[in-house]
Curated annotation (Swiss-Prot):
Protein name: UPF0102 protein BF0634
Signal sequence interval, chain numbering: none
GO molecular function terms noted in the UniProt entry: nucleic acid binding
Any Pfam family hit: UPF0102
Amino acid sequence: MAEHNLLGKAGEDAAVDYLERHDYVIRHRNWRKGHFELDIVAAKNGELIIVEVKTRSDTDFALPQDAVTPQKIRRTVIAADTYIKLFQIDEPVRFDIITVIGKTGNFRIEHIKEAFYPPLF
């Protein structure tokens, strides 16, 4: 596996650990349907939380959350809609971003709640 892929997996693992420490229940990781993927699907307090994880070794070039473009938001919302319909979920939905910066074992994590809202298509 390429080094950037290893960093990404370590970042997702760190994000899951963070969420579990904060009493989130992880429903799925890397859930896929067709071409769509959700990094983490979690639940807490009767709410479904869709989490996009962005991992970077540093912020010299840009902030990790800057990689969540309007196109990425659109794809995430479509994937979430597919997930909700497939599993017949009737709960409020929230879209979060977790940024993971640093090296494995020494990550800095930021949880951005309600990072974006579903756009109108």
